[in-house]
């Protein structure tokens, strides 16, 4: 299983220093302990929402696993930290998750049909998704089929001031 983990810069999570590779702890309970991660990348933003001052990693949860009904959160006793995701990669993974799981909740910060970037990004899903943002913002789009929630098209762009202009839908 592949999952995602948000952290403070330097791979710090609630005061705990993680490292690349295998990290081990004794217990896993989503409410209290263990290494936490999420199956849906967007759920990381619920816990590490300051996108400009957080880091996001591709991880593999192992050992004892615990899940709860809050979101796609997972707690585990063994967490393999595989690699850091660049901002655009993070949102591409989020779009892929939506396409692979069209019936699942979209996760934190996914807007329906129309979104304005905030905190450096906008993720929008719908029949005719539109978004706008400031210079440097990342815009991620998931277009649904006309007759259902299946994702037909994914796209991602960065407002660069040349091909993609600021504050234009």
Predicted feature descriptions by range:
Residues 1-169:
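Short, glycine-biased loop/turn motifs at secondary-structure junctions and
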């Amino acid at each position: 299983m592949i999952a995602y983990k948000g952290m403070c810069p330097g791979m710090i999570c609630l005061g705990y220093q993680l490292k690349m590779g295998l990290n081990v702890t004794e217990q896993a309970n989503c409410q209290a302990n263990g290494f936490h991660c999420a199956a849906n990348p967007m759920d990381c933003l619920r816990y590490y929402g300051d996108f400009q001052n957080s880091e996001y990693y591709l991880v593999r949860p192992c050992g004892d696993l615990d899940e709860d009904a809050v979101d796609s959160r997972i707690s585990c006793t063994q967490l393999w930290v595989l690699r850091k995701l660049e901002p655009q990669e993070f949102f591409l993974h989020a779009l892929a998750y939506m396409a692979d799981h069209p019936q699942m909740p979209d996760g934190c910060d996914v807007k329906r049909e129309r979104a304005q970037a905030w905190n450096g990004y906008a993720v929008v899903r719908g029949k005719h998704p539109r978004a706008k943002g400031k210079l440097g913002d990342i815009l991620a789009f998931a277009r649904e089929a006309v007759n259902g929630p299946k994702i037909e098209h994914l796209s991602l762009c960065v407002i660069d001031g040349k091909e993609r202009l600021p504050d234009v839908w």
